[in-house]
Amino acid sequence: MSPLSIIRTARGLAAGMALAAVLVLAPQFTKAQATKPVPARPAKPAPAGMSAACLACHKTNTLEGSVHAAMACQDCHTILPGEGKDVPHAKTLPPVDCTAACHREPNRTQPGLSPAAYADSVHGQGLKRGEKDVAHCWDCHGKHNIKPVLDPASVVSRKNIPLVCSRCHENMNVIIKYNIHAESPYQEYMKSVHGRAVYEKGLAGFAAVCTDCHGVHNIQGVGEIHKQARNPETCGKCHPVIFAEYKDSIHGREALKGNIDVPLCVDCHGEHTVASPRDIGAPTSKKNIPDTCSGCHARPEIMKKYGIPADRIRTFIESFHGIAIGLGDKAEANCSDCHGVHNIRPAIDPASMVHADNLPKTCGRPGCHPGMPEKITKAKIHRETGVKGSATSYVIFKILLWALIAVAAITIVRFVFELTQKRRRPKTP
């Protein structure tokens, strides 16, 4: 036998002996381990500062995963002596004041985010009056389960904020008690361009949620003069280009002066129901623009203050453009096609789309009247069709009116005649 064979044989014998030893000794070792007492698992230490007395009754499951996991119970709760043997503290503890020791420093870069601003908000003022329905810190942020705002599981993460606000603002008892004009803001928001962007397109980091418009801790009531939710500058944070146009328009300049007569963004686009102009039901859709503008321009008491005739909407509706829009023509010009959208200016302003020098360009756009003679643009646009207007327009209007009546009458007479003749015909077997 060669030396190599001898070595291999020796290795095989050693491996076999080792395997036999394992098979014989393993059951004995396992049995010994089973009979050996297992030491008790050490109890999980209580969070820092939490007394054993608290843990005897209260679990820490939710607190352990929150931003306040390292805090002690007494950091938030004022522990009063108990009145009986079963409860080591008073049955009802004083409400927690989050701004007493921790959240009291103002946020200098974004004052609205400062929890201290809550005291002057519509919720904080209600709390001072003793109102029991107003939102406290924990109603929005949670109680022991508070998580960072950027955590998707946080109740105040951007995607969850509309639902949190709806707990109160879609509660009809609260709405009626405090005369809140928006009865179903959450349902309206969910159907708006903002709500669809958040929940259908996943744009919670970009599309507006409640706090972007109304504020965070500094939420104001309806009666506030400079209410954030109606301020065009609020919309301008997301729509800076549009706000820049609006700011230089006749409406924007007056709005920034505090003039309450001029339309703000929400007056034309809506509040929680903001929809795309392509949506047929939107107040800014092609067909609905005249009705939206009439909210101001058909009110004599407002128009009189600024020397503007209050018949502008009516005369437009009676014009060829207005009639075509009423019949569903989506390509016909409406108010915004001629006057502008966010850049509306008085007709005497050289930058206005309806300034005399700019009408050829405005009316001659592709899709409207390209190549139209400049002389035609000098004609009056909002022309009265009655006796107060021009004689030519009045005569044409009357001719067309009587022609329409005649055609309608002839159609009715012919229909009745044919129906009578049909009934008189003998029935064929």
Model-derived segments and spans:
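Bacterial N-terminal signal peptides
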Residues: 14-26
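Short sequence/structural segments immediately N-terminal
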Residues: 3, 25-429
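Bacterial N-terminal signal peptides that target proteins for export
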Residues: 2-17
